[in-house]
Swiss-Prot record:
Organism: Bos taurus
Entries under Gene3D superfamilies matching the protein: Rhodopsin 7-helix transmembrane proteins (1.20.1070.10)
GO biological process: neuropeptide signaling pathway
Subcellular location: Cell membrane
Identification of the protein by name: Neuromedin-U receptor 2
Assigned keywords, A-Z: Cell membrane, Disulfide bond, G-protein coupled receptor, Glycoprotein, Membrane, Receptor, Transducer, Transmembrane, Transmembrane helix
Function: Receptor for the neuromedin-U and neuromedin-S neuropeptides.
Gene for this chain: NMUR2
Glycan attachment positions: N6, N24, N191
CC terms in the record's Gene Ontology section: plasma membrane
Membrane topology: Multi-pass membrane protein
Residues annotated as transmembrane: 48-68, 80-100, 121-139, 163-183, 212-232, 263-283, 299-319
Length: 407
């Protein structure tokens, strides 16, 4: 995340210029200009970050591993979830350590202009890639629910990879404006000499440029996408509710609906959690961009928002694997194939499966296939095009890949 609290502190201190000449101590003068060298919330926030780091890194590595390892997990939808996991790992492994270091030592910034550009570009790129990935998977799910035959033809792995290439390319491109206005700022004594250890990574161009960029990107990469996503899931909800009242093709519905509803439910929860976790981040940025004159009460409110937004920002990088494990039986089964047996045995003693949640899972050396998300009630013996070949084909491993690559 971008560090704004020191910037707001600097603006407050511009009103106190007459008192600067009375400060002869370098540390005191630097503290007046840049604020405290170490955040007073360093210890509690670091403890929270450490927990998020462990859960997020382990969880997202598992997500990446099961998608790469199991052929049947390489679906278009899972490719978008893989992209989210990669962006989360970038934030946790590269962004969080920088954030913790800056909380421990706000200044000087030790990594030079290149490090400043990298830090800014990283957070901007991940921010844009995450929301674009969530938007894309929501559009794919919308097509799969409302236009299933079109999705069957067009929703392919190759298409998903091409879309993800565009997503990450656009994310890097749109990160450049904000990155270009950041740099290393040095502070000076009244006599014009540089204050030792005063280098900070911050905005070095006129603030109106920064404010404009933040307001535009918040609109394009949060407000508009979340509005579109909300409409899409509303329409999907209407469609799924309508399907519940249809009596025709009971066997087909019995096979398709549980999986379709389960995946849609999981993605809806994913989007909802994403929106909640990222809202403070954008509130933080917009708050800073709209304040023209800083006062102590405004600075106090902003600093509180900044801390909360930081926790939720990193929390969003850790919760996705938990959502997959809770709401997707396919991911649950895949996780079991990569988790050490000792951990699985301990978990099985505490959570024995009940009869109401039976699953038909077939594990081979290269495949992990789940027939249905939940066991649905049995209908009288009827056959359809979909139901006639599904059980035997799965058991013999002769199902074409395109049949297994369900969204």
């Amino acid at each position: 995340m971008e560090k704004h609290e020191n910037v707001s502190w600097m603006y407050q201190q511009e009103l106190k210029d007459p008192f600067k000449k009375y400060l002869n101590n370098t540390d005191d003068y630097l503290a007046l200009l840049c604020g405290p060298r170490r955040s007073h919330l360093f210890l509690p926030v670091t403890a929270v970050y450490a927990l998020i780091f462990v859960v997020g890194v382990v969880g997202n590595l598992l997500v990446c591993l099961v998608i790469l390892r199991h052929q049947t997990m390489k679906t278009p939808t899972n490719y978008y979830l893989f992209s989210l996991a990669v962006s989360d790992l970038l934030v946790l492994l590269l962004g969080m350590p920088l954030e913790v270091y800056e909380m421990w030592r706000n200044y000087p910034f030790l990594f030079g202009p290149v490090g400043c550009y990298f830090k800014t570009a990283l957070f901007e790129t991940v921010c844009f890639a995450s929301i674009l990935s969530v938007t894309t998977v929501s559009v794919e799910r919308y097509v799969a629910v409302l236009h299933p035959f079109r999705a069957k033809l067009k929703s392919t792995r190759g298409r998903a990879l091409r879309i993800l290439g565009i997503v990450w390319g656009l994310s890097v491109l749109f990160s450049l404006p904000n990155t270009s206005i950041h740099g290393i700022k040095l502070h000076y004594f009244p006599n014009g000499s540089i204050i030792p250890g005063s280098a900070t990574c911050t905005v070095i161009k006129p603030m109106w440029i920064y404010n404009f960029i933040i307001q535009v990107t918040s609109l394009l990469f949060y407000i508009l996408p979340m509005t579109v996503i909300s409409v899409l899931y509303y329409l999907m909800g209407l469609k799924l509710k309508k399907d519940q009242h249809l009596e025709a093709d009971k066997v087909t519905a019995n096979i398709q609906r549980p999986s379709r509803k389960s995946v849609t439910k999981m993605l809806f929860v994913l989007v909802l959690v994403f929106a909640i976790c990222w809202a403070p981040f954008h509130i933080d940025r917009l708050f800073f961009s709209f304040v023209e004159e800083w006062t102590e009460p405004l600075a106090a409110v902003f600093n509180l928002i900044h801390v909360v937004s930081g926790v939720f920002f990193y929390l969003s990088s850790a919760v996705n694997p938990i959502i997959y494990n809770l709401l997707s039986h396919r991911f649950q089964a895949a996780f079991r194939t990569v988790i050490p047996p000792s951990c699985q045995q301990q978990h099985s003693h505490n959570h024995s499966p009940g009869p109401s949640m039976q699953r038909n899972i077939f594990l081979t050396e290269c495949h992990l296939v789940e027939l249905t998300e939940d066991v649905a009630p049995q209908f009288p013996r009827q056959l359809s095009v979909l139901s006639s070949q599904l059980p035997t084909a799965l058991c013999t491993g002769q199902v074409p890949r395109k049949e297994l690559a369900k969204s």
